[in-house]
Amino acid sequence: MPLKDLPLDAQPREKLLARGPAALSDAELLAILLRTGLAGKGVLQLAQELLDDPVRDPATGRSAGGGFGGIAGLLHASSQDLQRIKGLGPAKRAELMAVLELARRAMAQQLREREVFDSPQAVQHYLQLHLAGRTHEVFAVLFLDSGNRLIAMEELFRGTLTQTSVYPREVVLRALHHHAAAVVLAHNHPSGSVQPSRADEALTQTLKAALALVDVRVLDHVIVAPGAALSMAEQGLV
């Protein structure tokens, strides 16, 4: 249904102005950005389709259509990912990518400006925003100062859906570059499970030993999946 056919107080823009953004659903907020749908598909339907769960190929686990699994997944959509959505032309893709990038930068700035990390949950939430929507495996490191304040986050290695090659020497060099006193390791499981594998446990201990040689502590290793995160430190595995 076209927005103009909705009652005025149910149209997303007017609803936002009258009641504030918290009163709107994710799809309604997204519809304001998109502004228009396409023939046979209203903008609210288009917005909801972007937020729907992805359809995965059972053989490979890769996305084979559908949406991005919510706002967190949409945050990591590339221009190529958005291009497959019928109804998103170059102008809409550019506007959407700009807004999503601003959201990522705001989260990064907020975390950098914390006096210290409030809790493991705050770090997990930040990592979910950055990693949960990826369709390939990424290994990232949060570099911290002596007060556990964030210096930088870097994605150091990218792999397939099932494995990634992580080189301890490179992690150590980046820690020295940032003059880090501690690190939080992180990687995602695109398959959806946050349970650590034996390889995850072995990698954690290898990196912990390598970083200890340069007096850098490993505080945690966080595993991220769509809608979930697990702290290996809280499981006694660090």
From Swiss-Prot:
Alphabetical list of InterPro entries matching this protein: MPN, RadC_JAB, RuvA_2-like, UPF0758, UPF0758_CS, UPF0758_N
BP GO terms, sorted = proteolysis
**A single GO molecular function term of this UniProt record:** metal ion binding
Q: Where is this motif: JAMM motif?
A: 187-200
List the SUPFAM superfamilies.
JAB1/MPN domain, RuvA domain 2-like
Residues recorded as binding Zn(2+), renumbered to this chain, are: H187, H189, D200
Give the range the annotation lists for the signal sequence: none
UniProt domain MPN: residue ranges:
116-238
Q: This protein's superkingdom? A: Bacteria
Q: Which PANTHER family match?
A: DNA REPAIR PROTEIN RADC (PTHR30471), UPF0758 PROTEIN YEES-RELATED (PTHR30471:SF3)
- Family, as annotated: Belongs to the UPF0758 family.
- What name has this protein been given in UniProt? UPF0758 protein Dtpsy_2777
